[in-house]
């Protein structure tokens, strides 16, 4: 007979093949990283999986961290539909759901696990179909941005007197997803995930957001680039996010592994998509044929609640010189240093700094146009990779596990060879302050103030202000 059970009583026993066992409620009494470590041991079939790095005092402290309490409430809100034994199904699904929530590349705007999960009779496979309704309403004044996302690059210069104020709302971000969680003798724990939402053309058309598979240390599919550190990004209600981050989704194959509980390394081969400003007369963009390569090395402490990461990106950008009838390959690269620091159990600090040449299509602001390769001044038929620099500073404070606030300050700067002295983008500034309230584990509301500025090389500038309100239901 089919039955439905709630995960309100959490009981997890994670056992490696040498019988190293985590006690009940281990995911709560250890940080996100500790749980992830246990799961990776299971997926890899590791011979030894020790939790000696977390003493009783540290575990007790981590159990009170608001993020862990919040994750516990999310997992509690998932119901099981299956024909197996209730206790076995509950334990198995809770362990599988941890792989869903404890993810290096999980974004703060990603949907929560489905409200209902179907469990196989063997309790080794769970599948759920979920949805997310997200409505944002916003009001711009003293200059408005003509798009839903708050992007400083899109601030009009000069101000349009017919659009000094703007009231609008968007369902962009509303969507559906399917996830499959399971365990196999050879693969270990695995996950498949497909997500679509209505953030396509005009903010309403259906768009594929993610489609990937994970098994052990491997990920393959359409997923977040390895160059991005989502955990170091302060959360925003605004869909665009801080303009200084590097954010992109690519078709990729990634390997990621953690050593001795402190170090994580990852590398990926990612299918390219360059953005080249060829004029079609003297220069022409060539098809991409060399994959982008991304990697990072990360050191974590405080049970994984804090980390510092160095990320790198390498790519080849190809164009044709129409005057000399020759193709040229330009090397593009990017470096990023990012961190999240848990200064107090309820207080987090965030920081990101990046620099590169020819990586502009990975940034938030400069991806709005073609900046990977631009015209070389004074040399017809030649292109080069300009430099761009970005940074993000942020903080987050939990008043309670269900009420928290974020602040974010960000800048993106563009450095061409020569000062063009025209209306070309020079830098953009972005600021956000918000407040979130989880009324229930699946119903969230929030409000946010946004301020932005765009400065051009000819010293003309524009600014914009926005108040955004959001409500979100995940099911």
Locate each region found by the language model:
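Outer-membrane beta-barrel "beta-signal"
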Residues: 437-439, 463-475
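Outer membrane beta-barrel
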Residues: 120-149, 161-274, 289, 294, ...
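Surface-exposed loop/turn segments flanking beta-strands in extracellular/periplasmic regions
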Residues: 148-158, 371-377
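Bacterial Sec-dependent N-terminal signal peptides
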Residues: 1-61
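N-terminal periplasmic/intermembrane-space "pro-region" immediately following the signal or transit peptide
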Residues: 23, 27, 55-141
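Detector for outer-membrane/organellar transmembrane beta-barrel domains
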Residues: 299-419, 425
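Sequence/structural signature of outer-membrane beta-barrel proteins
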Residues: 140, 183, 197-203, 227-229, ...
């Amino acid at each position: 007979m089919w039955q439905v059970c709630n995960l309100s009583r959490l009981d997890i026993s994670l056992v490696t093949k040498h019988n190293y066992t985590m006690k009940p409620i281990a995911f709560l009494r250890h940080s996100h990283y500790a749980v992830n470590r246990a799961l990776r041991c299971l997926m890899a079939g590791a011979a030894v999986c020790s939790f000696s790095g977390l003493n009783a005092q540290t575990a007790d402290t981590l159990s009170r961290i608001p993020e862990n309490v919040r994750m516990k409430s999310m997992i509690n809100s998932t119901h099981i539909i299956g024909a197996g034994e209730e206790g076995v199904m509950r334990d198995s699904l809770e362990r599988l759901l941890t792989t869903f929530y404890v993810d290096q590349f999980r974004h703060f705007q990603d949907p929560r696990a489905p409200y209902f999960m179907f469990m196989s009779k063997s309790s080794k496979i769970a599948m759920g179909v979920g949805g997310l309704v997200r409505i944002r309403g916003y009001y711009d004044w003293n200059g408005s941005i003509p798009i839903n996302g708050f992007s400083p690059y899109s601030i009009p210069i000069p101000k349009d007197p017919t659009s000094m104020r703007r009231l609008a709302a968007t369902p962009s971000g509303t969507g559906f997803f399917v996830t499959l969680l399971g365990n196999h003798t050879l693969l270990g724990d695995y996950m498949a995930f497909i997500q679509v939402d209505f953030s396509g053309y005009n903010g309403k058309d259906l768009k594929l957001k993610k489609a990937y598979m994970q098994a052990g240390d491997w990920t393959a599919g359409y997923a977040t680039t390895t160059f991005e550190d989502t955990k170091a990004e302060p959360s925003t209600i605004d869909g665009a996010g801080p303009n200084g981050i590097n954010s992109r989704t690519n078709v990729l194959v990634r390997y990621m592994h953690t050593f001795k509980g402190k170090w994580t390394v990852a590398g990926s081969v990612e299918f390219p998509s360059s953005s080249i400003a060829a004029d079609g007369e003297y220069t022409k963009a060539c098809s991409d044929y060399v994959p982008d390569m991304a990697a990072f090395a990360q050191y974590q402490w405080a049970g994984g609640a804090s980390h510092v990461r160095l990320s790198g990106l390498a790519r080849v950008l190809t164009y044709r010189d129409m005057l000399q009838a020759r193709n040229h390959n330009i090397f593009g690269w990017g470096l990023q240093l990012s961190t999240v620091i848990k200064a107090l159990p309820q207080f987090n600090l965030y920081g990101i700094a990046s620099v590169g040449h020819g990586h502009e299509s990975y940034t938030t602001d400069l991806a709005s146009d073609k900046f990977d390769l631009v015209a070389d001044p004074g040399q017809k038929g030649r292109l080069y990779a300009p430099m761009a620099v970005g940074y993000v500073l942020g903080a987050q404070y939990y008043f309670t596990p269900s009420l928290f606030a974020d602040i974010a300050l960000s800048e993106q700067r563009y450095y061409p060879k020569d000062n063009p002295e025209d209306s070309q983008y020079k830098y953009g500034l972005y600021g956000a302050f918000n407040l979130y309230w989880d009324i229930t584990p699946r119903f969230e509301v929030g409000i946010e103030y946004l301020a932005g500025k765009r400065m051009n090389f000819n010293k003309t500038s524009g600014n914009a202000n926005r108040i955004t309100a959001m409500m979100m239901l995940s099911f």
